Amino acid sequence: MSMQDPIADMFTRVRNGQMASKVSVSMPSSKLRVAIAAVLKEEGYVSDFAVSGDVKPVLEVTLKYFEGKKVIESIERVSRPGLRIYKKKDELPKVLGGLGVAIVSTSKGVMTDRAARKAGMGGEIIGYVA
């Protein structure tokens, strides 16, 4: 059975891993998943990530906790295969009034809503993290 929405699967694995207080979660790797993991690391939501394996690459995301509490309060998919959500540069959403981030896929790569606004670019809203 093929996976219908790999990004929703990634978000679910991270959410479930944090609820179960896991140190890290593993998933099949792809360029988009690695780019999303890089944004999460850059914003301080995960400790680290690594790709291993040649034939079937596996992405391992090391989760982050602060004083025993999970760092990611919520992670949700916005644009999905059945309903893509695109926003122009001045329509990009602010998650929790700027406390969270929206992950945006632009023509220059995957970045946060703040970076996209600064670059003057819009794109597909992949998801929200807070």
Swiss-Prot record:
Part of the 30S ribosomal subunit. Contacts proteins S5 and S12. The keyword RNA-binding applies. Gene3D superfamilies: 3.30.1370.30, 3.30.1490.10. One of its GO terms (molecular function) is rRNA binding. It comes from Pseudoalteromonas atlantica (strain T6c / ATCC BAA-1087). GO terms for biological process: translation. This is Small ribosomal subunit protein uS8. The keyword RNA-binding applies. The gene is rpsH. SUPFAM superfamilies: Ribosomal protein S8. InterPro entries: Ribosomal_uS8, Ribosomal_uS8_CS, Ribosomal_uS8_sf. One of the primary rRNA binding proteins, it binds directly to 16S rRNA central domain where it helps coordinate assembly of the platform of the 30S subunit. Pfam families: Ribosomal_S8.
